């Protein structure tokens, strides 16, 4: 019973195949946003990026078959377990507040263009 309860809080290690798939997504997209469709911070992120460029990729973790595993892989790779999880030019940016801070400092547009 204890192992079952523990499984709610501890995810098993992510397979190398899933990690490779996530890395491939990061490497093949200039702007990549992992998000959940119901998340208001994710909507803010999409709106801001859309205002700068139409060229970005979104992965909706809550509708993806491997969404939970992908989110676990992202946590292992970046230390971030929340969404949105944003990458620009293969660099991990962080979440919406990090993106908004870059915009406020005038540093986002040069990254996107």
Language model features with spans:
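N-terminal targeting signals for export/organelle localization
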Residues: 1-13
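Folded extracytoplasmic luminal domains of secretory or organellar precursors
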Residues: 15-18, 67, 98
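Local sequence-structure signature of Cys/Sec-based thiol-disulfide redox active-site neighborhoods
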Residues: 18-59
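Short amphipathic alpha-helices and their capping/turn residues within compact interaction modules
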Residues: 27, 31, 54, 79, ...
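N-terminal G-site of the GST-like fold
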Residues: 43, 53-82, 88
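Non-catalytic, surface beta->alpha helical segment in thiol-disulfide oxidoreductase systems
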Residues: 88-113
